[in-house]
Amino acid sequence: DLHLLSRRQRQMCIRDSGTSDIAVISLGGTVVSASIKIAGDDFDEAIVRYMRKKHNLLIGERTAEDLKIKIGSCYKRAEVDYMDVRGRNLVTGLPKTVKVSSEETEEALRETTAQIVETIHSVLEKTPPELAADIADRGIVLTGGGSLLRGLEDLISAKTGINTMTAENPACVVAEGTGRYAEVMEELGK
């Protein structure tokens, strides 16, 4: 549970509606933030491009999303999952099935997730020292549907050295938080 008016800070990586917004929140306001035009659809598009380049296989965004949800990962995992992916062979024009591994999805998503990590680094570099120390102690919280991508917590933790966790019910937490914030601000205004 994030407390919007708390003196203890958190960094949030909010991922929805076509952008990834990375922000340091303190005392009910944004201290430092940055946005990049990357969201869940960009993960799907990266998988479509990878399948075309690596396997000469044309797949749709729905198939890419299914692959992402079922076995997709952006960080090495102990176990490797596989999925048969159907599409159109770009050489012959005929239907083709390819067995794809979760390791391949990591490769497909590498460039996109690297941009998110770079933006987090940028926000941390601009964060006042006291707030940065608090973030290092308390961690980074991921919200939004994109935060459900397997391995994202581990990737961000590995690249920043900061514990990273996904909020409970991440797809709804932004809307719920906005509602709570409005209630608190209304009470303070009275």
What residues fall within each predicted segment?
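Short beta-strand scaffold segments in enzyme catalytic cores
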Residues: 20-25
